[in-house]
Swiss-Prot record:
One of its GO terms (biological process) is proteolysis. Transmembrane segments: none annotated. InterPro entries: Creatinase/aminopeptidase-like. It comes from Klebsiella oxytoca. The gene is map. Keywords: Aminopeptidase, Hydrolase, Metal-binding, Protease. It catalyses: Release of N-terminal amino acids, preferentially methionine, from peptides and arylamides. It is an enzyme of class 3 (hydrolase). This is Methionine aminopeptidase. It comes from the Bacteria.
Length: 43
């Protein structure tokens, strides 16, 4: 956790993502995440 210029608290997190020919897969989703684990490319 860090403080911003205006002294607000801020946090960062990252995901591990596998990029494939067909799209990508997020490997580090939590149970409460609302984004899809697999994102496909539309061709």
């Amino acid at each position: 956790t860090v403080k911003t210029k205006d002294r607000s608290l801020s946090a960062q997190y990252e995901h591990t993502i596998v990029v494939t020919d067909n799209g990508c897969e997020i490997l580090t989703l939590r149970k409460d995440d609302t984004i899809p684990a697999i994102i496909s490319h539309n061709e």
